[in-house]
From Swiss-Prot:
Catalytic activity: K(+)(out) + ATP + H2O = K(+)(in) + ADP + phosphate + H(+)
Source species: Salmonella heidelberg (strain SL476)
PROSITE patterns, alphabetized: ATPASE_E1_E2 (PS00154)
Protein location: Cell inner membrane
Keywords, comma-separated and alphabetical: ATP-binding, Cell inner membrane, Cell membrane, Ion transport, Magnesium, Membrane, Metal-binding, Nucleotide-binding, Phosphoprotein, Potassium, Potassium transport, Translocase, Transmembrane, Transmembrane helix, Transport
CDD domains linked to this entry: P-type_ATPase_K
Pfam families per the UniProt record, alphabetical: E1-E2_ATPase, Hydrolase
Protein's name according to its UniProt entry: Potassium-transporting ATPase ATP-binding subunit
GO molecular function: ATP binding; ATP hydrolysis activity; magnesium ion binding; P-type potassium transmembrane transporter activity
Subunit structure: The system is composed of three essential subunits: KdpA, KdpB and KdpC.
Record family assignment: Belongs to the cation transport ATPase (P-type) (TC 3.A.3) family. Type IA subfamily.
Length: 682
């Protein structure tokens, strides 16, 4: 569930952005953007020239120079406004997070148990390693791990999701976030961070942009823009002696106007806004990125590692069939499977009980009256079951049951081996049931592949992105599900070490890898991946290892993260193409206006039929400023994203933004020229 989206132009944000745009007119603020600093310097110079002309210190048209100066200042202001508006949207999102932070007191325990003596201390004084007791109705005062107890927790202030979640000691659901509220019961929490380092603090800092640094692609593009600016600066500087030698020197005002129109001011003015807006869009998807670098890396990803359960399949495997061993009837198998599952609260365990009831009317037994000993599932044993009336019933993975049978002096039947293989080939997960050393048969657990997922993978394949399914299932089951889902490859019987090795293998081939994870055992792979989306419901170790956190804890979100990253890169590339293509029309407007008096042959370049040299220069400068305002919505929302191959995407952008960058200025400059003529300003 995503939090409330801000309108693109909220009135409150517009007013604040206008104020911030004026504040950014200082030289120190402008120096951060070399392209716009040149425009700022040109604005200052033409302002001084206007004042000198008004006071009669130098000759020239004060009106013409003044209008040029005014629109150069507008160009700087519009660029500042774009950046301030993007930052304002992020700050508004940060302010909503700040509302979660409350000054509160915490019960700091003197020993790590719920009945230990407690001291009431301000939450801000809690340090890493402190133990606190939190009861129903309390705000959790710090990020940490639950070491005792279990409780229902309202995380809506962080995630936007109204449904409460369970947090309890042990397992992958022990991580809690400061600022969330306990609805019932109590928790003993070990604080895992110091003041100012909480997840909420980091979220606020990231969203506000306090930690925003330019990404590698942004730096590379900035260097390109600086290089183009230097080239045009040198070219413009040589035009004055060139025109003076011809007997009619071009004025400094015209040269400044020419320089500003030729340098890539459009992308220069919007570049910062695009980066800030990319992180803001990521937050709109309920994903917190640690930096713009992470968002950018998401756009460059070409390998996705996707967990099968919850991402590719619905994640609620259901018992679909009982397949007895030779000499065993199906009812006997169903009865044993149901007994072994009575204390199994997993969806799979409950589905086995229900299937036995539906098939053979085997009613669920009263657990208390059985006087049985239940054997829980563990990662080591990989099986669970029940000991009742001298009967020892177990269900589990094929390998685990085989070891169990052989250790009890039995043998694993060949017909059951064949049944296991048949179930796996159909994409189901086989569980084997055994009583003592006698194998009774196989339970087929069927997981459903999500609707539409195959089409999404086909779109990713068009974009050159390889999809790899990660699963703990055996190779046959994994191969069947992979074929049904349409992924490019799979890793079966996955372990943390195998995932880490796979990521390193792809990276050694020069690929960028993205993955999701929520457990402590995922932390090494998350730390190695280029884009690592940790689930908010996961452990502290997983969240610290990732460079993004999904507040919705939805593994499928990884695909959306890649889309947002690619959209940011496409927006930057498209507007750069548009900005550079713009120069052609401005060239046809200003060059004839500036030099036709010296070289009449250049009038042939006035293909737009502009009214006069002054109107041509004014029209180009005004268009140069206004186009920034018109492109702000595109910079903030991002260009329309379509899953295409790199070559198809390049062709599309060249047609839309390259050709558009050529045509739009011709039309815009001509329209402005006509208006200036009608107003008598030409």
């Amino acid at each position: 569930m995503s939090r409330k989206q801000l309108a693109l132009f909220e009135p409150v944000l517009l007013v604040q952005a206008l104020t911030d745009a004026v504040k950014k007119l200082s030289p120190r603020a402008q120096w951060r953007n070399p392209v716009m600093f040149v425009v700022w310097a040109g604005s200052v110079l033409t302002t001084l020239l206007t004042l000198a002309m008004v006071t009669g210190q130098i000759a020239g048209s004060a009106l013409f120079t003044g209008i040029i100066s005014l629109w150069l200042w507008f160009t700087v202001l519009f660029a500042n406004f774009a950046e301030a508006l993007a930052e304002g949207r992020s700050k508004a999102q940060a302010n909503s997070l700040k509302g979660v932070k409350k000054t509160a007191f915490a019960r700091r325990l003197r020993a790590p148990r719920h009945d230990a003596q407690a001291d009431n201390v301000p939450a801000a004084e809690l340090r890493k390693g402190d133990i606190v007791l939190v009861k129903a109705g309390d705000i959790i005062p710090c990020d940490g791990e639950v070491i005792e107890g279990g409780a229902s927790v309202d995380e809506s202030a962080i995630t936007g999701e109204s449904a409460p979640v369970i947090r309890e000691s042990g397992g992958d659901f022990a991580s809690v976030t400061g600022g969330t509220r306990i609805l019932s019961d109590w928790l003993v929490i070990a604080c895992s961070v110091n003041p100012g380092e909480t997840f909420l603090d980091r979220m606020i800092a990231m969203v506000e942009g306090a930690q925003r640094r330019k990404t590698p692609n942004e730096i590379a593009l900035t260097i390109l823009l600086i290089a183009l600016t230097i080239v045009f600066l040198l070219a413009t500087a040589t035009l004055w002696p060139f025109s003076a030698w011809g007997g009619n020197a071009v004025s400094v005002t015209v040269l400044v106007a020419l320089l500003v129109c030729l340098i890539p001011t459009t992308i220069g003015g919007l570049l910062s806004a695009i980066g800030v807006a990319g992180m803001s869009r990521m937050l709109g998807a309920n994903v917190i990125a640690t930096s713009g670098r992470a968002v950018e890396a998401a756009g460059d990803v070409d390998v996705l590692l996707l967990d099968k359960t919850g991402t590719i399949t619905l994640g609620n495997r259901q018992a679909s069939d009982f397949i007895p061993a030779r000499g065993v009837d199906e009812r006997t198998l169903a009865d044993a499977a149901q007994l072994a599952s009575l204390a199994d609260e997993t969806p799979e365990g409950r589905s086995i009980v229900i299937l036995a009831k539906q098939r053979f009317n085997l009613r669920e037994r009263d657990v208390q009256s059985l006087h049985a000993t239940f054997v829980p599932f563990t990662a080591q044993s990989r099986m669970s079951g029940i000991n009742i009336d001298n009967r020892m019933i177990r269900k589990g993975s094929v390998d685990a049951i085989r070891r169990h049978v052989e250790s009890n002096g039995g043998h694993f039947p060949a017909d059951v081996e064949q049944n296991v293989e048949n179930v796996a080939r159909l994409g189901a997960t086989p569980l084997v049931v055994v009583e003592g050393a006698r194998v009774l048969g196989v339970i087929a657990l069927k997981d459903i592949v999500k609707g539409g997922i195959k089409e999404r993978f086909a779109q990713l394949r068009k974009m050159g992105i390889k999809t790899v399914m990660i699963t703990g299932d055996n190779r046959l089951t994994a191969a069947a599900i992979a074929a049904e889902a349409g992924v490019d490859d799979f890793l079966a019987e996955a372990t943390p070490e195998a995932k880490l090795a796979l990521i390193r293998q792809y990276q050694a081939e020069g690929r960028l890898v993205a993955m999701t994870g929520d457990g402590t055992n995922d932390a090494p792979a998350l730390a190695q991946a280029d884009v690592a989306v940790a689930m908010n419901s996961g452990t502290q170790a997983a969240k610290e290892a990732g460079n993004m956190v999904d507040l919705d804890s939805n593994p499928t979100k990884l695909i959306e993260v890649v889309h947002i990253g690619k959209q940011m890169l496409m927006t930057r590339g498209s507007l750069t193409t548009f900005s550079i293509a713009n120069d052609v029309a401005k060239y046809f407007a200003i060059i004839p206006a500036a030099f036709a008096a010296t070289y009449p042959q250049l009038n042939a370049l006035n293909v737009m039929g502009l009214h006069s040299p002054n109107s041509a220069i004014l029209s180009a400068v005004i268009f140069n400023a206004l186009i920034i305002i018109f492109l702000i919505p595109l910079a903030l929302k991002g260009v329309s994203y379509k899953p295409l191959s790199a070559s198809a995407m390049l062709r599309r952008n060249l047609w839309i933004y390259g050709l558009g960058g050529l045509v739009v200025p011709f039309i815009g400059i001509k329209v402005i020229d006509v208006l200036l003529t009608l107003l008598g300003l030409a």
